[in-house]
A protein has these predicted regions:
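N-terminal glycine-rich phosphate/pyrophosphate-binding loop and immediately adjacent elements
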Residues: 3-105
Length: 105
């Protein structure tokens, strides 16, 4: 049996998921395909070395428009943005370091 879709979204990153949500809300039959075994794209936290986890680009989730968060009722699903006082730490060869983030002087 052949299945028919109005739209096929390639990639289950945060943009693809938001796109699929709005298309489905508009009444379209949507299919999402993702090559990886995890959804979220750049917004996921993954173990890159045993015992070490990082969210390389998870900041992208904080760029979601407030209207998208409301439309998708993400807060009811546990979505929340946690502000970090330090967003980046870069150690230097001479023992010094560079810290970047909101509120740092």
């Amino acid at each position: 049996m052949t299945k028919h879709y109005d739209a096929v979204i390639i990639g289950a990153g945060h943009n693809g998921l938001v796109c699929a949500f709005y298309l489905a809300q508009a009444g379209l039959k949507v299919r999402i395909v993702e090559r990886r075994d995890i959804v979220g794209g750049a917004a996921v936290t993954e173990e890159f070395h045993p015992g070490f986890r990082n969210s390389v680009a998870s900041y992208t989730v904080s760029l979601l428009q407030p209207q998208v968060i409301r439309d998708m009722k993400l807060e009811a699903e546990g979505y929340r943005v946690i502000e970090r006082p330090i967003s980046n730490f870069l150690p230097q060869e001479d023992g010094g370091y560079l810290k970047l983030g909101g509120g740092l002087e």
